[in-house]
Amino acid sequence: MQDERPVDQLTEAEAATELARLAEAIEAANTAYHTHDAPQISDADYDALKLRNRAIEEQFPELRRSDSPSDRVGGALAEGFAKVRHEVRMLSLENAFDLAEVEDWIERIRRYLGHVGDLLFTAEPKIDGLSLSLRYEKGRLVQAATRGDGETGENVTENARTIADLPTELDGAPDLLEVRGEVYMSHEDFAALNGRQEAAGQRLFANPRNAAAGSLRQLDPAVTASRPLRFFAYAWGAHSEPLAATQHEAIARLAALGFATNPLTRLCTGPEELLAQHAEIERQRAALGYDIDGVVYKVDDLALQRRLGFRASTPRWAIAHKFAAQLAWTQLEGIDIQVGRTGALSPVARLKPVTVGGVVVANATLHNEDYIAGRDSKGQEIRGGKDIRVGDWVQVYRAGDVIPKVADVDLDRRPEGAARYRFPETCPECGSEAIREPGDSVRRCTGGLICPAQQVERLKHFVSRAAFDIEGLGAKQVEALWRDGWIRQPADIFELPNRYREGIQRLENREGWGRKSAENLFAAIEARRRIALHRLIFALGIRHVGETTATLLATHYGSWAAFEAAMTRAEVGAGPEWQDLLSIDGVGAVLATSLVTAFHQEAERAAVDALAAHLTVEDAEVRAPVASPVAGKIVVFTGTLEKMSRAEAKARAEALGAKVSGSVSARTDVVVAGPGAGSKAKQAAALGIETIDEDGWLRLIGDA
């Protein structure tokens, strides 16, 4: 991104801080997009975050986090649907933004395969909708599931049956066949739907993608049936027999079975033909009648696809070549400051409504105070140093979804007297000092739990699906209960039944509640007094501690008593507890500091202790012993691995009973060093620890 310091100029400490920030931002974007069908940043901004994260990981492989966004697919599941575990994972795609990146992808494929001849590819439009997997047994549709987090989706079978161009029976199909594709809504149908919504006085949808996703995920199939959804098939999952030998032949087979496939799919050789097809599809984009945001390229030979395989979250044999963002000019009417769960002050532009790429937008992200001032977080100019002022005419862009980004300012149209924007140095919600920590690009409220905005956002996080997931207590209910003074901290939720059971009428008389729903809520709260350790750690809402990190911490410490005692004794920067914390692969100094600091802040600790008094915390699951050459050994991976991703290597080692550490110590048994290993390899040599390369590791575990 243009407002960021070049990766090759970052110090190791700056890179670690940046990776932590990116992990937090990408996780929030994933949840908004995949779980709530309500994106908070544009596709272009999201792609840029992922791209920068990948670039930093490549420059500093030893800093790669265990919860790296590079390994994540989709988001958490929504409430109300049964879970479906995908027999074959539904992965996301790597992105390319120009010809050079497409050529690099092709070259990586050639190197991986040792292939010097011509390669054939398919090119097809990337539909902007909701991914769906359809399972057919003996030719009958038996299950439909959303992508979810890639491993587990939502069962939307009855809703999917209402989609007109989705066959419920197949003639001549394999006994088992999972067909995958995209549910979408045409522009014409979207306009008609919003017209009906407006006439009925109901909420309008922001864009066709949100309308399609919201329609498919209705709890009442009759509502879905009333919505004009469509489906394009483009892939497959589990199958009892091959569909064909090539990608384009397999798509033709799906069409013969009765599925709608995209007519713009073409067979291409080399980057020049791919780029020509990309340009042709983009030329036709406005006339297609449905939203697309790029072109997907796939290796055509399915045998080669199988050889290429997958990284942690993307196939090696496919890539999405995205379109450039869409632009428009409008006037900035105001700047609001929102305060998030971790105290971040986020500026939001309030715009005179403008149509960008067919969608009316009125808000835009302004990132942080430096972005408004026309510089990046290191003081270097962006936009030629032009600052952003209320009243300015600004250029905004979007590339598929809601809140866009302010890209430029027209100084010639700046109103006389427009004043420089002064970013608040106190929290607009609680008045506490808002400070910027070294290396942080945002200003944060220091009020902690006395800040009402942080209170309510933390409570929302606490009841989220990956945390306590209390049925009947979602974000809206939490906000209402907080607003009326019923809850202020997580412990208050568990006091609700005792405090209000006698006066249950108080709750049932609230808007949206009845006696049954109130009784169900109290029962759900009681059920959550027993909680898994990793869920509790995640629910605390400590900065930088995501789901994956919470699981790592739970696995490492085993019990709440051990975890709580270690955090109590730990001191930032020194001591055995600190070193033990840093030994966890994926836990760096930034995350560890955040964790230890939280347990040493008086208000934070009081809230944690009050909560723990209500709970029975289940110990982390202990894996059964595994017989392998590395079982029980502590392994450190450093440098670049060429035959598998770091995440794949870590998963394989742990499956064989090894413990993967993020740092080298006297307790380390084996260091696996790839190119660019750096200080960890030197430290291992100094300690006399066995060091092997990737091939040696594969021989050791029997995968050579």
UniProtKB/Swiss-Prot annotation:
GO molecular function: DNA ligase (NAD+) activity; metal ion binding
Coiled coil location: none
Domain of life of the native organism: Bacteria
Main enzyme class: ligase
Cellular compartments per GO CC: cytosol
Ranges where the BRCT domain occurs: 625-704
Named cofactor requirement(s): Mg(2+); Mn(2+)
Keywords, ordered alphabetically: DNA damage, DNA repair, DNA replication, Ligase, Magnesium, Manganese, Metal-binding, NAD, Zinc
Positions annotated to bind NAD(+): D43, A44, D45, Y46, D47, S92, L93, E124, R147, E182, K298, K322
Matches recorded under InterPro entries: BRCT_dom, BRCT_dom_sf, DisA/LigA_HHH, DNA_ligase, DNA_ligase_AS, DNA_ligase_CS, DNAligase_adenylation, DNAligase_N
Family annotation (Gene3D superfamilies): 5' to 3' exonuclease, C-terminal subdomain, 6.20.10.30, BRCT domain, DNA ligase/mRNA capping enzyme, Helix hairpin bin, Nucleic acid-binding proteins
Enzyme Commission number, as recorded: 6.5.1.2
GO biological process: DNA repair; DNA replication
Record keyword DNA repair present: yes
Residues annotated to bind Zn(2+): C427, C430, C445, C451
Residue positions of the active site: K126
Substrates-to-products reaction catalysed: NAD(+) + (deoxyribonucleotide)n-3'-hydroxyl + 5'-phospho-(deoxyribonucleotide)m = (deoxyribonucleotide)n+m + AMP + beta-nicotinamide D-nucleotide
Cross-referenced PANTHER family: CHROMOSOME TRANSMISSION FIDELITY FACTOR 18 (PTHR23389), DNA LIGASE (PTHR23389:SF9)
Family membership noted in the UniProt record: Belongs to the NAD-dependent DNA ligase family. LigA subfamily.
Entry function: DNA ligase that catalyzes the formation of phosphodiester linkages between 5'-phosphoryl and 3'-hydroxyl groups in double-stranded DNA using NAD as a coenzyme and as the energy source for the reaction. It is essential for DNA replication and repair of damaged DNA.
Protein name as it appears in the record: DNA ligase
Natural source organism: Cereibacter sphaeroides (strain ATCC 17029 / ATH 2.4.9) (Rhodobacter sphaeroides)
